[in-house]
Amino acid sequence: MSVRSYVAMTCAGAVALSSSLAFAHVSVSSPGFANQSQLLTFGIGHGCEGADTSKLEVTIPSSVTSVRVVPNVFGPVEIKKDDAGNVTGVIWTNPQPRAADEMYYQLSIRAKLPDAPFTTVLFPAKQTCKDKDGKESVVDWKATPEEVAAAKEGEEPEPAPAVLIVPVRKLGWNKFTIKEKLTDLTAFDDAQIVWSGAAAYSSNPATKDQIKNEDGVTELKEIAAGAEVWVKY
């Protein structure tokens, strides 16, 4: 059975697009759609050395616009703006930190992401914690993916919350032009299959095996700038 036929038969088993929130650090729901307003939720997976989170300050990049803060469990928030009135940061303060680090918090905004498919937007965050004795500690979640990848043994840079931007799509086949070279194909992990010429990519293990065993088909590992791809969702 060909890869194309196999994918058509396994449509019902395709992975649906979902917002992921990591539980190991401060994260943000991802992916997000290019040039669209949507809910972005920051997840605070843990406090600091056993202390509860007392405050989270998130920097809003200039490419992210139309920011609105969603009511949250912490209560009133501080919204920082520049001289033009653009939101540059949001500060959530927990009025009653718990005596122990035992909560998973979610804090949300609604915002419009830039029209830049297959790029990543970072939201540097500063997490403040307060223990039962009132002692504060701070963690800066600001490292870029490049800094995290380049970290030496023993180094543990704190990654900034990141949103992977994907183009708006429809069910079925979609044709996209890649503007910049793409070496990380996880942007397509919710797709059934991606084709670029005679090369194909899928995050689905069964489809991946079909790609490897199909005559005349190679595994797609990166996509050149300017290349056209066909993606089935």
Describe each model-derived feature in a short phrase:
Residues 22-24:
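Boundary at the C-terminal end of the N-terminal hydrophobic targeting segment
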Residues 29-71:
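Low-complexity, serine/threonine/proline/glycine-rich extracellular segments that form mucin-like
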Residues 35-40, 52, 105, 119-123, ...:
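Short, solvent-exposed loop/turn segments enriched in Ser/Thr/Gly
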Residues 78-102:
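Extracellular adhesion/glycan-binding regions together with long Ser/Thr-
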Residues 95-119:
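Low-complexity, intrinsically disordered segments enriched in Ser/Thr together with acidic residues
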Residues 130-171:
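Extracytoplasmic/periplasmic copper-protein system
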Residues 168-233:
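N-terminal exported-region signature
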